[in-house]
């Protein structure tokens, strides 16, 4: 930086790398496009799988956009931002992670010629936001309502989601599992919190072995625990269940406790006191005549002995999340102290308590429950990799089912909605004046990336198919014409039963266009060395390559 012809003043550290203006914007566009090209081949039913080596040396085989991108380590900040998009999409609606990355990359590419021609990013961003508003209006206009009480209609929508996955061969099975699980959770009746409740109360348990057809949704829960004593009952019909969040052990001192014993009877007295205390705790439980006691904390040998004498089965150190699910299926209330237990806290809704040995581990099943509001989804499969991919596919399917129940509207898949919105934007672009018209029209062309990618992954002639598709959408009455993902043929998506939830589609458009706008507004990228703490005694600190890291000044508490 020069000032008045004098010596340059260095404001930034010499190690700092800085890109600004057009150079930074073009670098962001290139990084975004590079990330989107990674997942392009994983879109649609004819998608390819990616094999990734994770940092621990394990292998991940998947075509799930979010699962691929979270395993990839990138340096460019714009690329990191793109990867974050897939995570947000997965968190919000569970599906459409690949589509959102492809579309965001295409939106960035569409802006490149305008940046090169020195059109100000604010003009591009304004046009993009206007195109987003028009797109949302058109999508909502094209949406078709669905009857959520009709399982056939919901299954058709779910099969479109699972049809693009590795487990598409077992599509019917996985859609049935997802639908049954969501209907079980919905008995709680809170649609607004359905997303949170599915994560909390629908637990996927993976057990290697068996075949995929052995997978099932339990009308209850299962967890990986055994009873604490081999003589306790492993099979109980209609058990009375008590759930605790406290240890059944003699209370230990808060800090270091010293006990001074003056005579030989003191030891006996101390042990006697412990036995009486535990007997009192157990009696508080036993007066409610339970069959099963489950606690999140420990159970001492003495407490086990007292409970075993009354034929009570005990399970200890259960996870908090598992205990919450057991509470929902058994009707029991989790109690913090044994003396506070009341008759209304005892669970009576569970029909069968059973501990089974599967492989070399014991699993506890609490099934045949009356109107359970939580469930366990048991997945069986040949190997760990297959089970992990099944779980990812089931997660997407559960999310799509949740979206359908929350917002029961569908839009056509197979790129039909993109082509129809593209055609609509193209028509109204002529009414936009000034420079805004060019980026607005660019959004229309960028939307064609989805049908183009579908055609490309099918191995058909992309140019011919997209030209034909564009011509059909410019005519009236062809709103639902798209590309059939398996054959690459141009088909009516309504007849082919390829549907997507409107919530997923709206989220894809909003996330892709808004993130592209955010990245286009960046005109300066500064990257430098981070602050490092100096080792005690003033010795210099070295990084992983043995290079000395310069000392940093200021108090460590400065943040």
From Swiss-Prot:
Entry GO terms, CC: chaperonin-containing T-complex
Pfam families the UniProt entry points to: Cpn60_TCP1
Keywords: ATP-binding, Chaperone, Cytoplasm, Disulfide bond, Nucleotide-binding
Subcellular location: Cytoplasm
Keyword set includes Nucleotide-binding: yes
Tree of life domain: Eukaryota
A Gene Ontology molecular function term of the record: ATP-dependent protein folding chaperone
CDD domains xrefs: TCP1_gamma
Disulfide feature: 369-375
Keyword Disulfide bond part of the UniProt annotation: yes
Function, as annotated: Molecular chaperone; assists the folding of proteins upon ATP hydrolysis. Known to play a role, in vitro, in the folding of actin and tubulin.
Family: Belongs to the TCP-1 chaperonin family.
UniProt xrefs under PANTHER family: CHAPERONIN (PTHR11353)
Complex and partners: Heterooligomeric complex of about 850 to 900 kDa that forms two stacked rings, 12 to 16 nm in diameter.
Name under which the protein is recorded: T-complex protein 1 subunit gamma
Source organism of this protein record: Tetrahymena pyriformis
Lineage per the UniProt record: Eukaryota, Sar, Alveolata, Ciliophora, Intramacronucleata
